[in-house]
Amino acid sequence: MSTEAKCPVTGGATRSSSAGIQSNADWWPNQINLGMLHQHSALSNPMDPDFDYAAEFKTLDLDAVIADLKALMTDSQDWWPADFGHYGPLFVRMAWHAAGTYRIGDGRGGAGAGQQRFAPLNSWPDNANLDKARRLLWPVKQKYGRKISWADLMVLAGNVALESMGFKTFGFGAGRVDTWEPDQGIYWGPETTWLDDKRYSGDRDLENPLAAVQMGLIYVNPEGPNGKPDPVAAARDIRETFARMAMNDEETVALIAGGHTFGKTHGAGDAALVGPEPEAAPIEQQGLGWISSYGTGKGSDAITGGPEVTWTQTPTQWSNFYFDNLFNYEWELTKSPAGAWQWVAKDAGDVIPDAFDAAKKHRPTMLTTDLSMRMDPAYEKISRRFHQNPDEFADAFARAWFKLTHRDMGPVSRYLGKLVPAEHLIWQDPVPAVDHKLIDAADIAALKAKLLATGIAPTRLALTAWASAATFRGSDKRGGANGARIRLAPQKDWAANEPAELAKVLAALEKVQAEFNAAATGGKKVSLADLIVLGGCAAIEAAAKAAGHDVTVPFTPGRTDATEAQTDVASFAVLEPKADGFRNYLGKGDPRAPEEQLIDRAQLMTLTAPEMTALIGGMRALGANVGGAKHGVFTTRPGALTNDFFVNLLDMNMSWHPAAEPGVYELRDRKSGAVKWTATRVDLVFGSNSQLRALAEVYGTQDGEAAFVKDFVAAWTKVMELDRFDLA
């Protein structure tokens, strides 16, 4: 009898691993992924529990780091020689590709955690040979150690590379804290093979929130859509993918033209001669991949992708040659030595330097996506303006590069270092600085009483506080209660926020605010942002008291109120929840199951599974559902902070059955068949999923209510303070 393990479905051999023969996900692929809620913990982090990266960075000699990086740019190594004797373009590409995974749809990706070091990003086809760039950086990282993270160093190297090639950057903000394991919470696409594009449907409709055209690419295929060399069709892909990275047409042109002012692509020979990516490479290669057997495998023989293109006459010096060449020549289609589509200038002289032979020159070459900057009418208009106004182009590229490399860092208050620009930009979601004396403990107590006396139901106060704070995304540090943007477009009009009810609550809170501020002395004021959160605190305390528990919900003032001028409506529109399981709200447009959407939102809010469980139980006890729906409100005492949700969910005297309404279930008495409660899939998953049921059982015991109330208050406070970076 063979001892080889076989997959029970396919009959194929399975591979044993430290996790077991088959993972649970292999056996049950539809199982929800709670693991994404428990990543990046102290168990994978080698730093001390009290390690403070911001404090360490402040001790760094940043000038010395920059000097070392500048020296590195021209210190060509035999094991991976520098094109044109300068590593600048390689480090620009490394930083660009680290940041360029960002997508505005869910805020995930980006350079903020150093994820390019790990799978899958370290082995994406589009990141070929960036492993060499990071190895070139190792001596600098080794020298300065924990004072600068890999995430910061990779972006800084890109900035220094640009500066070393004569370009003036807009600035640099540090503060990116390294993670120590691959991020399992990012959906990169449905494909199971590199460069596949199952993400499209209909008339090239790209699945949300994806922001690249194929699996393993950062943005678009440089040869054109699916390798078809059509610049106009490529422009459509470019516009869509860059927009999903929060870039408009002008920023897109600036980034492409600015980035392609430098360096070259590498398609010296047959790509079939390139070895496996880092994650598939043999152990003796020590994490390096793409080892090529074509010639020397490096230098003039390097193969990174397919095209072999050098865009400008001075590939290691800032210039306007990109636009000169784009518009001064006509272009004909050709193929690289690797067989990839590219374009060569007609009737042009040999004016482009060779990367390794000073005696050789080449004709200008371009990618299909470069010609999009000329063939697409909107891109062409911008390109010609930049061509005629080099200073405007330089400023646009500097700003777009800064945005590219900082878009996932959140507010400027998180930036570290002396190179942070003084100018605040609207995409940083600015809020005013505190310019008044904050309320004290006596004021807080008095305001709570006034808020509860407004006539607004406590549950509605809690819903408003939740709607304000739960927009936060830990992915790109956007959203949250600070700024009180719930009173502004677009948030005030979101369906999940029940605009008509919200307007009543805000009017009542604004009256309390106006009365307090008019009567306060000594420059003391309360912001509406603080008052919204305080209303939630008062509501939770009242609900706990109604259940027989005396609690104080922690509250720290210090939020301010943003203005319309500080709020980019289009940028904030992406924060609108398509679903919010905590409020039992399910909108349209997301094909995932409601429970999957709940887990996704919990992960964006940096919640653990126990925190998520406590919050669901508490919100249901409050009756805090959108539209006043009764689904999941398994209690005869709505508004009291009891553990009834868990007790009744787990009651084996009852059974659940699908209702006539899609997505709704009925809880019936097993003997009489009478319907007692209704629920959604979000509610039922806490009894269905074994891990969530185990958590529900903790709170559903006779002695579980006190622990539940304590844990709910802690989780609630965490949500209210997710964007309070000043408290960290």
UniProtKB/Swiss-Prot annotation:
This is Catalase-peroxidase. There is a cross-link at Y219-M245 (Tryptophyl-tyrosyl-methioninium (Tyr-Met) (with W-96)). InterPro entries: Catalase_peroxidase, Haem_peroxidase, Haem_peroxidase_sf, Peroxidases_AS, Peroxidases_heam-ligand_BS. PANTHER family: CATALASE-PEROXIDASE (PTHR30555:SF0), HYDROPEROXIDASE I, BIFUNCTIONAL CATALASE-PEROXIDASE (PTHR30555). One of its GO terms (biological process) is cellular response to hydrogen peroxide. NCBIfam families: cat_per_HPI, PRK15061.1. The record marks R93 as: Transition state stabilizer. GO terms for cellular component: cytosol. It catalyses: H2O2 + AH2 = A + 2 H2O; 2 H2O2 = O2 + 2 H2O. Residues 1-20 are annotated as: Disordered. Belongs to the peroxidase family. Peroxidase/catalase subfamily. Residues 1-19 form the signal peptide. The active site is at H97 (proton acceptor). It comes from Acidiphilium cryptum (strain JF-5). Bifunctional enzyme with both catalase and broad-spectrum peroxidase activity. Its cofactor is heme b.
